[in-house]
């Protein structure tokens, strides 16, 4: 077998007996504490190097290593880190560390034994508490004066009810302990464990815990057969809530009327058809005063108009547009009729109406009794032709100058243009005035009074 290696010691300083985690840190410590020149503060590596530096540079002699413990101040001993330490000092260091390790182990073992003993001491009071509970179980239960002792619930020791804190009664005239209930207000286990108890219907599976069965008012325990007289007296003393509805209170005026109306519509029971179930008419409710009366009146008028239109769809509406005149608003709101479009209303204006001659009345001519010829000369109206109308021109004749000559037209000669202003009797004539120039030809220069 190979030789067993000795356990490597942790880095430590031989001069001051101090432990370090790393040998590099130990070397830095020795240079700063033990091998530093006290004159020029130069850091050297060994003790002999410090002595030589002081002798050659400062002409001084050093006989001891600074900051060293007594007995380890030899300046001639060359130690660098862990190297150069005497063997006897290394063995002594190992022996000291082993003793220290043994002492620490003994302390840990002693502390562990003490902790085990403390745990045993902690478990002792629990047994005494159980004994005390057992002794209290044999003690008779004490109730309030005038009330017999309460029977313990099945499955619970008799002394548990005496350990529970008493609660003062919530209703005057009713004791806080009743038959079938414990002092803390909890129902007895017997009533819950026996669903077919006489006088109480069986517990329903759909009811959550804490909800009384149907037929019992919340807050009243079930009546037992042992004390029927006491339970009936308690029930008779309970105040009956009044069924009469409270008087209607005045509704405060909201800051924003729309929000107040929304709240008024939302409040109240609602049926399956999303209609309020109360029979109070809406007209009896007092409407709050709106912040903006003009807009509110316009909304009310629009609503009333819509309701009247829906109720009477067969009647024709010829009413004028509704005009709102308010004292608080400066604007004037006009609401046109919804059944008539804006185009139809505009067509009814007088400027779009056509003046048709009545029977027995002479036609009205915008141009007077004379008409203007093609060259601007005045021409007398011919008999048998309708007068010219201003702003009207008829389309080209079907055969005109591009086809066969017109037949049956008075004053027309073949090969020539028909006189300007004439045409079929049923076609309105052209507008009088000078002819337009052809494309690409400049108009003639006329006098100062002419059109050009």
Swiss-Prot record:
One of its GO terms (cellular component) is spindle matrix. Changing residue 452 to S: In xBuGZ13S: Impaired coacervation. CDD domains: SUF4-like. Keywords: Cell cycle, Cell division, Centromere, Chromosome, Chromosome partition, Cytoplasm, Cytoskeleton, Kinetochore, Metal-binding, Microtubule, Mitosis, Nucleus, Repeat, Zinc, Zinc-finger. GO terms for biological process: attachment of spindle microtubules to kinetochore; cell division; microtubule bundle formation; microtubule polymerization; mitotic sister chromatid segregation; mitotic spindle assembly; mitotic spindle assembly checkpoint signaling; protein stabilization. Residues 329-361 are annotated as: GLEBS. InterPro entries: Znf_C2H2_type. Coiled coil: none annotated. Residues 99-131, 298-330 are annotated as: Disordered. The keyword Repeat applies. It is found in: Nucleus; Chromosome, Centromere, Kinetochore; Cytoplasm, Cytoskeleton, Spindle. The GLEBS region mediates interaction with bub3. Mainly composed of disordered low-complexity regions outside of the C2H2-type zinc fingers. Coacervation depends on hydrophobic and aromatic Phe and Tyr in the disordered low-complexity region, that may promote coacervation by forming intermolecular hydrophobic interactions. This is BUB3-interacting and GLEBS motif-containing protein ZNF207.
């Amino acid at each position: 077998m190979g030789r067993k290696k000795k356990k490597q010691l942790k880095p430590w300083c031989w001069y001051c007996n101090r432990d370090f985690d790393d040998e590099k840190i130990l070397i830095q410590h020795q240079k700063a504490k033990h091998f530093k020149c006290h004159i020029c503060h130069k850091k050297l590596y060994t003790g002999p190097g410090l002595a030589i530096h002081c002798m050659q540079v400062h002409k001084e002699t050093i006989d001891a290593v600074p900051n060293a413990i007594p007995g380890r101040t030899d300046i001639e001993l060359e130690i660098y880190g862990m190297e150069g330490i005497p063997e006897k000092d290394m063995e002594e260091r190992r022996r000291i560390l082993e003793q220290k390790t043994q002492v620490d182990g003994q302390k840990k073992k002693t502390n562990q034994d003490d902790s085990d003993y403390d745990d045993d001491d902690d478990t002792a009071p629990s047994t005494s508490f159980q004994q005390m509970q057992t002794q209290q179980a044999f003690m008779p239960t004490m109730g309030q004066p005038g009330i017999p002792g309460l029977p313990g619930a099945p499955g619970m020791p008799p002394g548990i009810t005496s350990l529970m804190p008493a609660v003062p009664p919530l209703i005057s005239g009713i004791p806080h302990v009743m038959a079938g209930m414990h002092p803390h207000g909890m129902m007895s286990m017997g009533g819950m464990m026996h669903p077919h108890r006489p006088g109480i219907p069986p517990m329903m599976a759909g009811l959550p815990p804490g909800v009384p069965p149907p037929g019992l008012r919340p807050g009243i325990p079930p009546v037992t057969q042992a004390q029927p007289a006491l339970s009936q007296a308690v029930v008779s003393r309970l105040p009956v809530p009044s069924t009469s509805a409270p008087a209607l209170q005045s509704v405060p005026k909201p800051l924003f009327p729309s929000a107040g109306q929304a709240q008024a519509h939302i409040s109240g029971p609602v049926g399956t058809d999303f209609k309020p179930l109360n029979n109070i008419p809406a007209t009896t409710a007092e409407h709050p005063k709106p912040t903006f009366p003009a807009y509110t009146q316009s909304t009310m008028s629009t609503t009333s108009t819509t309701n009247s239109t829906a109720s009477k769809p067969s009647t024709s509406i010829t009413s004028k547009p509704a005009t709102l005149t308010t004292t608080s608003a400066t604007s004037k709101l006009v609401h046109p009729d919804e059944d008539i479009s804006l185009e139809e209303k505009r067509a009814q204006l007088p400027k779009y109406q056509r003046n048709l001659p009545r029977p027995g009345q002479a036609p009205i001519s915008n141009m007077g009794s004379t008409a203007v010829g093609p060259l601007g000369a005045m021409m007398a109206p011919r008999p048998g032709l309708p007068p010219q109308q201003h702003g009207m021109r008829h389309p080209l004749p079907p055969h005109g100058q591009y086809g066969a000559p017109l037949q049956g037209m008075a004053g027309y000669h073949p090969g020539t243009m028909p006189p300007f202003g004439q045409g079929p009797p049923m076609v309105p004539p052209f507008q009088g005035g000078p002819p337009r120039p052809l494309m690409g030809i400049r108009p003639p220069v006329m006098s100062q009074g002419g059109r050009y």
